[in-house]
A protein has these predicted regions:
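Formylglycine-dependent sulfatase
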Residues: 23-268
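Positively charged n-region of N-terminal signal peptides that target proteins for export
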Residues: 1-4
Length: 268
């Protein structure tokens, strides 16, 4: 596993040097900046740089990065949200971490304390670390990104249907979606309070739908120092533009953690 993690870190560093040379030059030469973008439900033939006109999808910005940098033709990836993120962040096969199926609110499996974490490795090497978007590695306080090496997290914890309740109009008239994704109660997380009307209390931070976007911070990437605040519900309407909010949060983090100002590289 350690060899795999080391190889993973090397690949990320190589990828950053190839694709983000300008940004990397701002950080100390031996520690390049790392900006990794993960997309859900995207296959190789959804990206123009790979399908080369055989499919209808157009991805000009991604294609430009590929044309100016490097493309990888051989790779390993898990084919679900939770399993893919587990493999990426830990370097472990998801089965070993007990994180194979997509996580639902209140799930008893989650990313356990002490699990190897790429973010923690990089934080220990002097990186400023942040994650933005969907996490999907469990909703326990111990599973949040800011308990596993990230100093900041802004985003949401499940797939969109679980965030909003059931999104189909003919079903959405139900007051809750308990039969699909049971509401549950907070575990003690500084800044978040148990919502009214929850049922089946569990050791988790999920809410009755629509569930909230949260903003968490931890100066040293540990659960002990993490605190979170509610950034408002991720409704069906908000989900149409939440990517713009995520982009704004990433840009703000990069501005605040500019290596020219902090003398530290970043991992986002």
């Amino acid at each position: 596993m350690n060899r795999f993690v080391h190889l993973l870190c090397f690949v990320f560093s190589f990828l950053t040097l190839a694709l983000f040379g300008t940004a990397a030059a701002q950080a100390p030469a031996e520690k390049p900046n790392i900006l990794f973008i993960m997309g859900d439900d995207i296959g190789i033939m959804n990206v123009g740089a790979y399908h080369r006109g055989l499919m209808v999808g157009e991805t000009p910005n991604i294609d430009r990065i590929a044309n100016e940098g490097a493309q990888f033709m051989t790779y390993y990836a898990e084919q679900s949200c939770t399993a893919g993120r587990t493999a990426f962040f830990t370097g472990m096969h998801p089965l070993r971490a007990g994180m194979v199926m997509p996580q639902l609110p209140g799930a008893t499996s989650y990313l356990l304390p002490g699990t190897p974490s790429l973010a923690k490795f990089l934080l220990d090497l002097g990186y400023n670390t942040g994650e933005f978007g969907k996490n999907h590695l469990g909703d326990h306080a111990a599973a949040l990104p800011t308990a596993h090496g990230f100093q900041e997290f802004w985003g949401y914890l499940y797939h969109l249907d679980a965030m909003q309740g059931v999104s189909f109009p003919d079903i959405n008239s139900s007051p809750t979606d308990q039969a699909v994704v049971p509401p549950c109660e907070n575990t003690p997380v500084k800044g978040l309070k148990p919502p009214a009307g929850t049922v089946n209390p569990r050791d988790a931070i999920c809410m009755t739908p629509p569930r909230p976007v949260i903003h968490c911070t931890s100066s040293n990437g540990t659960q002990k120092n993490q605190s979170c605040k509610d950034e408002g519900p991720l409704t069906l309407e908000r989900s149409k533009t939440v990517d713009e909010e995520i982009s704004a949060q990433v840009i703000d983090f990069l501005d605040r953690n500019d290596p020219d100002k902090t003398d530290k590289p970043f991992f986002v």
